[in-house]
Amino acid sequence: MSVKLSSNRIEIRLAGEGGQGMILAGIILAEAAAIYDNKNAIQTQSYGPESRGGASKAEVIIGPGEIDFPEVIAADILVAVSQEACDKYASNLKKDGILIVDSDKVGRVPTNRAIQLPITQMAIETTGKSITANVVTLGILVGLTGIVSRQAIEKAVAARAPKGTEEMNLAALEKGFEAAAQANGK
């Protein structure tokens, strides 16, 4: 499945449960765009009162010019790594938007155009840790869309990875790129 984004302003929502790392993924994506690709980007986040298990989302807007409204109006891309997130946010996806779901966590998708990949399983197979699923997700997202350069996301992941885990996180990112290439039939 080849993915094209038509808008100059790209609105991305990464949503799941607390502890799945979607907020960190949003921060890394925004840093890749703003710091390493010299694009304008803004990142916002919200989460429930629970430290783990409650709903959480990160929104990233990337554009060539000034970003005058810092929230997603209608998502170009929705990444849903929990059923609750998919159910809650899929209706706010643009008609031609891209829905990426973790098939390990999301059983019901509202469209046959969804890109369904076993993200958590890929993370465990690659790094032995489900916590790296957020970085696998970034590889898939960037690999499918090209919203930031591969070099930018690699630098941003390496900069945010806890000391001593850079190699593991870059392996998770690479796994995401491989999954995106397979989804694109390349």
Residue map of PLM features:
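Active-site cofactor/cluster-binding pocket
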Residues: 2-186
